[in-house]
C-alpha cells in the first residue's frame, strides 16, 4: 500500500508519523497543531524550536530560523493526506525554504548479538567536579547550540527520526543516541535481537557525584520516562495504559496499585515491571480537540510569567489528577507520596547546597517518580549557580530559593513547566526574580 511513498510502512505496519522540516519561524507549535488538526486528529506532536539567541551566538544574526516537528496522527490515511497537501496547508510564500514533510523513520541502532546495557545513557558517569556545561564534555552544551540536526553528533538526541540506521557490530562502542523524547514508538525494536537491561535503556542520567557514588539505585532513574513508550513491556495482545484509562478500566489511583497487571502477558521483560509507574497519557478526544480549538487563547503562551499550565480534574471514582495543557499529560495525586524521604532528611541537615545538590533537588525532592516534570525541565536544566534554599526559624524548609540558567529560554521553560505544579500539598510558584528583566536568566 502506498509503495510510491517512502517509508509509508515500517516492517509492514502503516506509518502514522510525519517528520516536517523547514517550518517558517512565524508558525508556532500551537499554530501548527491548529492547522494540521483541521485535516486529521493529532495524537502527539514534538516541536523543535531553535532559539534566536543561540543562533546569534553562532553568528547567524541575519538568518531566518526554520523549525522541525514530529507529528503523530490517529490513522495512516490522515498522515498521508497531510503529507500530500502540506504545502497547501502551510503558506510558505516569500520564505527562503519550502516546507517539507515525509514519513518519519525511527533512528534505531541495530546491534545484533550485542548486550551493551549503556546504549541509552544520557550523561555517562560525568564527574560533576570537572564538568563544564558550556563545553562539550557532557555532550550537551556544544550540541544544544548546534544547527546540524542531521549530523552524527549527540544532537541526534533531539532529532529522533532520520533515514540513517547505524549497523555497528563493535561490542565495545557505546551508542549515545538515547532517543530522549521518542513518543508512542510502536514496533521500534522489532529487528533488534538485543536483550538490553530496561533500567539502563531508560536511564536519563548516570552522574558520578563528588563521593563517586552513582545514582543507579535512585528509583527515579529506573522508571520509564513518560515520553519513552518502551513497547518491550507490552505485547500485541495486551492493552496499553492509554487504552485502559480511556476505556474506564483503570483510574490514576489504579495506575500505581495495580501496575504489575499491565504486563502479565509479557514473558520477556519481567525484571523491571515494578518500576513502570509511568505518567499516564490523557487521550480523551474532547481534551485534545479542546486544545486544538483554543488557538487564540494560547497564542501568548510565551508570556510565561505567572502562567499555570496545570488544571485539576476528578475521574469517575472521584480521584484527583492533574492535567497539563501544554504537554497533554496527567498525573495522579498519589504519585507524589513516592518521594524519597531519606534524601529529603539528608538535605534538611545540610547547611548549604552546592550545584550537584540543587540538581538533585530538582530530580529527586520535587520530582522523584515524576518523570513528567523531570523530562520537561531536564532538556533546559543547565544551572550556572544558585542561592541556598533558606529555612525558617522553626527549621522548616520555606521552599524559597534562586536558580540561574545560562540562557533566557531555559529560564522561561522552567517557569512554564514548573509554575502551578502541585507537590507536597502546595502549588509551586515559579517566576522571574523581582527586579530582573527578561534579558536576565534568574528564576
From Swiss-Prot:
One MF term in the entry's GO annotations: RNA binding
Source superkingdom: Eukaryota
Biased composition (Low complexity): 256-277
Annotated segments matching region Disordered: 253-279
Domain RRM: residue ranges: 16-106, 342-435
SMART domains for the chain: RRM (SM00360)
Alphabetic keyword roster: Malaria, Repeat, RNA-binding
Pfam families in the record: RRM_1
Protein name: Clustered-asparagine-rich protein
Organism: Plasmodium falciparum
